Each structure stands twice: as C-alpha cells, then as structure tokens.
Amino acid sequence: MSRAIIKFIRLSPTKARLIADEVQGMNAELALASLSFMPNRGAKYIASAISSAVANGGFEPEEVVVKSCRVDAGPVLKRFRPRARGSASRIRKPTSHILVEVSKPESKEA
C-alpha cells in the first residue's frame, strides 16, 4: 500500500469530496481516465494525487486499486470586501488536504 498527500489546495473540501467519492474503490488506471474527462477543477488535483501515490509505491496504474480517497478541510483564508456605509463583509477562501491510498487488489479465494 502506498499513499500520497497534497496539502493546502485552494479548493472547497465540499466540492472536492464529490469527486473523491466517485473514484474510491476504482482501478487506478480507470480512475485516472474518468478524472481526465471531468470538468471539475478538483478532478485535476485528485488525478495528480492518484498518480503520485502509484509512483510512490513503484506500481503500474493498471495493477492497483484506489483504496481510499479522503478530502479534509485545511485552513480557511479570510478576506474582507468593502460594502456600503463603511461596513465590510467576509470572503472565505477554503483550502483542502487530499489523501489518496492505493494498494494491490485483494485476491478472492473460493
């Protein structure tokens, strides 16, 4: 089993989790192929994490399975936008941490 972590990505964890749930349990090669056709910005980061985890273990993409793909919330950057009458509203810029684990599929013995 090998893993890769990408930290402090300027992407909302809620949006990234939608993509992470799609690839969990998939073959790594199939997951990378399906992520390349997704229009979401988070798909690029998750594909990068999967290919990095495969390379960290010295595997080929077709021989491993995405065991887990977890997206955790990172720190939130807070900015202010000036509003009417001298007030201000808060702009939240969330960040994410992506953790991907890949491993060889467990053989099913009858």
From Swiss-Prot:
Keywords: Ribonucleoprotein, Ribosomal protein, RNA-binding, rRNA-binding
Cellular component annotations (GO), alphabetically ordered: cytosolic large ribosomal subunit
RNA-binding as UniProt keyword: yes
Entry superkingdom: Bacteria
SUPFAM superfamilies named in the record: Ribosomal protein L22
Gene source species: Campylobacter fetus subsp. fetus (strain 82-40)
Keyword Ribonucleoprotein: yes
InterPro entries named among the record's database cross-references: Ribosomal_uL22 (IPR001063), Ribosomal_uL22_bac/chlpt-type (IPR005727), Ribosomal_uL22_bac/org-type (IPR047867), Ribosomal_uL22_CS (IPR018260), Ribosomal_uL22_sf (IPR036394)
Subunit structure: Part of the 50S ribosomal subunit.
GO molecular function per UniProt: rRNA binding; structural constituent of ribosome
Any one Gene Ontology BP term: translation
Protein name listed in UniProt: Large ribosomal subunit protein uL22
PROSITE patterns: RIBOSOMAL_L22
Membership in a protein family: Belongs to the universal ribosomal protein uL22 family.
Function: This protein binds specifically to 23S rRNA; its binding is stimulated by other ribosomal proteins, e.g. L4, L17, and L20. It is important during the early stages of 50S assembly. It makes multiple contacts with different domains of the 23S rRNA in the assembled 50S subunit and ribosome. The globular domain of the protein is located near the polypeptide exit tunnel on the outside of the subunit, while an extended beta-hairpin is found that lines the wall of the exit tunnel in the center of the 70S ribosome.
Transmembrane parts of this sequence: none
Short name of any one Pfam family annotated for the protein: Ribosomal_L22
